């Protein structure tokens, strides 16, 4: 494991104690493979290195006027002064299983690294795995209609990297994984703008195996692979363990509720359902892409669309850099991009909300406004769209007479997920009626 070469902290120019220590003591493992014996060797290297570092820092600490603030530890030992400590601070197990940092040190590292990366015109991007970059199924969950896939896979043996291909059979895990179309181009282009993390609710072994499929040469993620075992809150994802300023972090995930504290950083992507088990998991009745022997479009799919959004937010952040960027917030840039999606649209809703509810409090109303639309409760000549579920409502009939667009709520949902205004003709009420009939 090479924290020195791969962690964003060590891409910075700071010469602080943590960076110096990790550079010196973990670099010896940077060229090793990921086999179990090598992990044990890396642990031994850290332990012996810790003893050497302890002697150096003890001498330095003894001549200092102030006491050591114990910025972090390996195991129960401060990596600055060597003093034994109680288990405190935030664990950074994905970097090293014994590593913990206190809040002040985390804040200092984030400040230092963010300043350095911004000089390189880079921000941070945290990426979910399942249904975002790829789709995985257990082999026993394959339908008979999907058995043909087994003859189209690349095989990933335990501990071996594979490059090329998009469908992988992981027999040692009894799994099959399909990479989302455009993912390799997405990662390559995104890496030029962002330091990237993987953050998954899967376990550590699964996370690392998926990282090998996505990044077989170790060019994009290094050790920045965070699993559910590394988080600070169960069943939630948080930026607590990401060493980047929240104002410089964007997140790509298919599940909004996974990030309750960081929704302003989040880009929600349409879920990738390649396998039938994925559709069943979310109670979708339509056939999966594998059953249809189809797939998303490379140039026009979800990842290609999101890449455009990332480029827009990145460009806005670094616009007019001569004016200074230290106080800029990429979350505001993301909101600015969203505001352009339905800009110029004025929407009236017809029997979409519960009768006694305040329309302006409904999530769909708020979503439309976040996308740049103006919402109203009454129709007039300036209205461009009526969102309804029944063409027989008074407002829907008015829209037809006045040659305004009548669409169902899916038009707004699609704009939200796809980050672009959608053709109204694809979301008419006749299409909705047909869809509901097919699902019955």
Swiss-Prot record:
Q: What's the superkingdom here? A: Eukaryota
- Where is it chiefly localized? nucleus
Keyword terms of this UniProt record = Hydrolase, Metal-binding, Nucleus, Repressor, RNA-binding, Transcription, Transcription regulation
Query: Which GO cellular component terms, listed alphabetically, does the Swiss-Prot or TrEMBL entry include?
Result: nucleus
Region described as Disordered: spans on this chain: 1-49
**Gene Ontology biological process terms in this record:** response to salt stress
Q: What induces it?
A: By NaCl.
Q: Which residues form the FCP1 homology domain?
A: 118-292
PROSITE patterns assigned: BRCT, FCP1
Say which enzyme class the record assigns: hydrolase
Which positions form S-S bridges?
none
Job of this protein: Processively dephosphorylates 'Ser-2' and/or 'Ser-5' of the heptad repeats YSPTSPS in the C-terminal domain of the largest RNA polymerase II subunit (RPB1). This promotes the activity of RNA polymerase II. Required for normal plant growth.
**Record-linked NCBIfam families:** FCP1_euk
Q: What is this protein called?
A: RNA polymerase II C-terminal domain phosphatase-like 4
Gene that encodes the chain: CPL4
């Amino acid at each position: 494991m090479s924290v020195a070469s791969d962690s964003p902290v060590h891409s910075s120019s700071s010469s602080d104690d943590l960076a110096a220590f990790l550079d010196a003591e973990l670099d010896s493992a940077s060229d090793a493979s990921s086999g179990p014996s090598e992990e044990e060797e890396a642990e031994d290297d850290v332990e012996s290195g810790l003893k050497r570092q302890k002697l150096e820092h003890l001498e330095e600490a003894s001549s200092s006027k102030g006491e050591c603030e114990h910025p972090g530890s390996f195991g129960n030992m401060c990596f600055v002064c060597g003093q034994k400590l109680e288990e405190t601070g935030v664990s950074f197990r994905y970097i090293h299983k014994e590593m913990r940092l206190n809040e002040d040190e985390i804040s200092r590292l984030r400040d230092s690294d963010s300043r350095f990366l911004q000089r390189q015109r880079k921000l941070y991007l945290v990426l979910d795995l399942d249904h975002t970059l790829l789709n995985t199924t257990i082999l026993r969950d394959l339908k008979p209609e999907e058995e043909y896939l087994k003859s189209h896979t690349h095989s990933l043996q335990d501990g071996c990297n594979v490059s090329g291909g998009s469908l992988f059979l992981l027999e040692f895990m009894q799994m099959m994984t399909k990479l989302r179309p455009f993912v390799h181009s997405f990662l390559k282009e995104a890496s030029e703008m962002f330091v990237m993390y993987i953050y998954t609710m899967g376990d550590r072994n699964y996370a690392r195996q998926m990282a090998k499929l996505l990044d077989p040469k170790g060019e994009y993620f290094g050790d920045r692979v965070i699993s559910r075992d590394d988080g600070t809150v169960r069943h939630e994802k948080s930026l607590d363990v990401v060493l980047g300023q929240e104002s410089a972090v964007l997140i790509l995930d298919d599940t909004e509720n996974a990030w309750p504290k960081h929704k302003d950083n989040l880009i929600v992507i349409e879920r990738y359902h390649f396998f039938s088990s994925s559709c069943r998991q979310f109670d979708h009745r339509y056939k999966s892409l594998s059953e249809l022997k189809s797939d998303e479009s490379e140039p026009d799919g979800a990842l290609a669309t999101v890449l455009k959004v990332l480029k827009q937010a990145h460009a806005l952040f670094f616009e007019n850099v001569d004016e200074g960027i230290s106080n800029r917030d990429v979350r505001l840039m993301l909101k600015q991009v969203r505001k352009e999606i339905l800009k110029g649209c004025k929407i009236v809703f017809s029997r979409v909300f519960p009768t006694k509810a305040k329309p302006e409090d409904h999530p769909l109303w708020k979503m439309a406004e976040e996308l740049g639309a103006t919402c109203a409760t009454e129709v007039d000549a300036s209205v461009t769209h009526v969102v309804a579920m029944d063409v027989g409502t008074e407002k829907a009939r008015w829209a037809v007479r006045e040659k305004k667009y009548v669409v169902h709520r899916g038009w707004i949902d699609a704009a939200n997920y796809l980050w672009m205004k959608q053709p109204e003709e694809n979301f008419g009420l006749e299409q909705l009626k047909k869809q509901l009939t097919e699902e019955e």
